[in-house]
Each structure stands twice: as structure tokens, then as C-alpha cells.
Amino acid sequence: MDRAVEAAGPEPIFSILPYHFKKVGIVTTGSEVKKGLIQDTFTPVLKEKLSEYPTEVIGQTTPGDDKAQITDDIMEFINQGADMVVCSGGMSVDPDDRTPGGIRDTGARVVTYGAPVLPGAMLLIAYYEKEGKCIPILG
């Protein structure tokens, strides 16, 4: 403990920052959802979970599996002032999945991809830097 105190000097070893209000954009991918073949049942759940925190969902888009449109939708939310963008709609281990490429094409720095959350479901965390802010993009 003495070494930790010495290393920190007069500053605390760590601090807990207050949670700030966040604007969130939701990009729901998947051609099945866009075509209306399946109902998007996750966005209402996601909005409910986000409502437990001081957030505002500034919009939702459904670009299907069009990689360029996924990228454009993410960037549109960032340009509208989103503090976070969540991509939902079935990102998977499927090599044809367009969501990871759409996120990468924003220029965001992908910090993790491939951690299976459920069998067949994947997690991607990326950060887009704009005007000194790191905006998380989750997929």
C-alpha cells in the first residue's frame, strides 16, 4: 500500500467520475428487420434499459445489411451529437455480417471484437474520436 501511495503522490489513486447525461443513437441492422420479415423486439428492450440512466435516444435507423448505410447512419448520429451509438440486430460470427465493417469504416478504433456473449453472438467495442471526445460505438 505504501508503494501505491508513493506512486500516486498527492493525487488519489483513482477517482469516480459522475455520470453525465448521454445522447444515444440506435442502429438496428439486419435485412430481415428492414424488410419486415421479423419484428424488432430488441430495440424496445434496449430503450428500456437505457431509460434507467440519464439518457436520451436521439433516433433509431434500420439500414439492413448495407455496410455503407450502417456507416452513414452511425456517422449521422455522431454528427447529431450522440455520445454513444449502439448497433443491434444480430451481429454474429457469420463472416457475411456487415456490422463490424460498417463500424470500422467510420474510422473508429476497434478495441475488442469477438468476445462471445452468447453462443453465436458477438461483442464489438469501438471508439470514434471527434473534437477531443471518444464516442463509444457498441455492436
Where are these regions (language model features)?
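Short glycine/threonine-rich loop/turn motifs
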Residues: 31, 37, 41, 54-139
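Short, glycine/charged-enriched hinge/interface segments at domain edges or termini
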Residues: 1-58
